[in-house]
């Protein structure tokens, strides 16, 4: 009897699409269904039909339901086995559409996820509060998450406390029924309540992010703290960069100023200046006066803590300069000094040459051949005796020599001086004219014998005036004295003004002019043997 009933129900559903089934009518007794089927066969058009008002075994109770059309409809009672038949697909589709429209399945899934993840002590008030929070968001499309994604989204919601909401009410089909991750047992239990739609399987999973509104400041301090940390780190980075740059600049300045004073960067030099200013106007003059004191190879460098100022030491060269470069620089300095001296000597007007200047010049020339200077020049094979470098040069004693001024009287031909007073006292007085002069010294001058012969001629002239006896005796005595003192005169070195040779052929006007010219350079001194004035050189 069941197979005719199923075929009849399918026909009724096909002919009357507006016919609705309700769940209570599915539990009508079989006899009521049979009675309704019998009455439906005998019914005519336009007559009202009676139906059972409630499910039950008695077939007598009926209710009249107007169908809204010309013919009344009879609702057949379905058995409890109606879900096994093809007719059950229609209400199932309707229920599925209702659940999808109102998001019932995702709502229960979200509730179960919250219960599982948060596990409150009182689950019913917790669910009520959650549903009340959902009540104000009817325009918002709810999305469900499971697992860690749901926990993350819910933590974001709890932090925002409902301040950030999505007020966009348009449909977003790409976010409906997002694809779920692999479900746990609890998720499977929840999903059995409402199976997901087949369309949701192909949709990608989306994660709910709250909308950012620039007008409202978020209550969460996490972003502000992170931004503050980033700003502080940037400030610290800039400060460290500036500090490192300033340290590098100060290190460069210290290297420039302390390069010659640092014991680590101090180069090895052979000599050292003592008591010499660093910015000396004439460094070579100080070098001549104070030669460098050489160091031995075993001497160790003194520390800079000894208190010696850097101005008192030799200006150090950088460490990369070798000994050869120092030697070349020293030679250049010497060559510049020599060229400067030669330039000054050329352009200087009538330099006065004295014995002290010659002595100093000789000392300076000897200083260049000293062992210390040769060591500074880079000579390694040195002979301590020094005879190798001073051959052919006279040795000058350290003590100063006595200066002797010699004058020759033109009348008595006697030398005038402190060491020759005894000889001049023995000379004979001879009368002469005071206009004639004699040179201060002969000094190995070529033509000294001619000068002596001229003196002999003068004595002959004088003898004609005084007498033959006196003249012969005076001339012979004076010639004898000249021959004895000739050797001593040649050995003497006197540096004075140029002398004036006597002449017996000059007239008195010429002699007066020469006397006037020489008076500026010579000094008149009385002769010790005769009353003749002798011109002595200054």
Curated annotation (Swiss-Prot):
Residues 20-71, 151-211, 288-331, 458-482 are annotated as: Disordered. Changing residue 161 to N: In a colorectal cancer sample; somatic mutation. Gene3D superfamilies: cAMP-dependent protein kinase regulatory subunit, dimerization-anchoring domain (1.20.890.10). It comes from the Eukaryota. Residues 154-171 have a biased composition (Basic and acidic residues). InterPro entries: DUF5586 (IPR040687). CDD domains: DD_VEST1. This is Uncharacterized protein C8orf34. It comes from Homo sapiens (Human).
């Amino acid at each position: 009897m069941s197979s005719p009933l199923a075929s009849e129900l399918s026909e009724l559903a096909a002919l009357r699409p507006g016919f609705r089934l309700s769940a209570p009518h599915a539990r009508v007794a079989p006899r009521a269904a049979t009675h309704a089927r019998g009455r439906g066969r005998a019914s005519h058009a336009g007559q009202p039909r009676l139906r059972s008002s409630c499910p039950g075994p008695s077939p007598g109770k009926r209710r009249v339901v107007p169908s809204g059309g010309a013919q009344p409809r009879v609702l057949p009672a379905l058995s409890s086995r109606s879900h096994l038949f093809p007719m059950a697909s229609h209400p199932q589709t309707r229920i599925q559409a209702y659940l999808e429209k109102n998001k019932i399945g995702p709502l229960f899934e979200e509730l179960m996820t919250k219960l599982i993840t948060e596990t409150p002590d009182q689950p019913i008030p917790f669910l009520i509060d959650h549903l009340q929070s959902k009540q104000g968001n009817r325009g918002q499309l709810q999305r469900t998450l499971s697992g860690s994604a749901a926990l993350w989204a819910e933590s974001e919601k709890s932090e925002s406390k409902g301040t950030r909401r999505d007020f966009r009410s348009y449909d977003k089909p790409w976010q409906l029924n997002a694809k779920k991750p692999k479900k746990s047992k609890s998720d499977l239990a929840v999903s059995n309540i409402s199976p997901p739609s087949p369309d949701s399987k192909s949709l990608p999973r989306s994660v709910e992010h709250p909308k950012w509104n620039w007008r409202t400041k978020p209550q969460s301090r996490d972003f502000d703290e992170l931004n503050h940390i980033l700003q502080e780190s940037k400030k610290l980075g800039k400060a460290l960069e500036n500090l490192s740059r300033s340290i590098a600049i100060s290190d460069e300045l210290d290297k420039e100023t302390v390069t010659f004073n640092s014991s680590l960067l101090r180069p090895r030099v052979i000599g050292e200046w003592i008591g010499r200013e660093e910015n000396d106007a004439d460094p070579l003059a100080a070098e001549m006066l104070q030669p460098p004191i050489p160091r031995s190879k075993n001497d160790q460098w003194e520390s800079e803590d000894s208190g010696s100022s850097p101005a008192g030491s030799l200006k150090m060269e950088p460490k990369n300069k070798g000994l050869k470069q120092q030697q070349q620089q020293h030679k250049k300095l010497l060559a510049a000094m020599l060229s400067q001296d030669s330039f000054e000597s050329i352009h200087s007007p009538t330099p006065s040459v004295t014995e002290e200047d010659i002595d100093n010049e000789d000392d300076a020339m000897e200083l260049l051949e000293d062992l210390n200077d040769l060591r500074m020049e880079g000579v390694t094979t040195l002979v301590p005796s020094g005879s190798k470098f001073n051959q052919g040069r006279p040795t000058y004693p350290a003590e100063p020599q006595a200066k002797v001024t010699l004058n020759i009287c033109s009348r008595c031909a006697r030398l005038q001086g402190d060491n020759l007073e005894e000889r001049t006292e023995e000379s004979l007085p001879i009368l002469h004219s005071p206009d004639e002069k004699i040179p201060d010294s002969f000094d190995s001058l070529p033509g000294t014998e001619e000068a002596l012969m001229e003196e002999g001629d003068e004595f002959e002239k004088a003898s004609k005036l005084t007498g033959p006896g006196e003249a012969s005796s005076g001339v012979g005595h004076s010639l004898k004295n000249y021959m004895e003192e000739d050797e001593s005169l040649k050995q003497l070195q006197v540096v004075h003004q140029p002398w004036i040779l006597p002449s017996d052929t000059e007239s008195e006007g010429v002699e007066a002019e020469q006397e006037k010219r020489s008076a500026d350079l010579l000094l008149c001194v009385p002769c010790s043997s005769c009353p003749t004035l002798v011109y002595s050189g200054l």
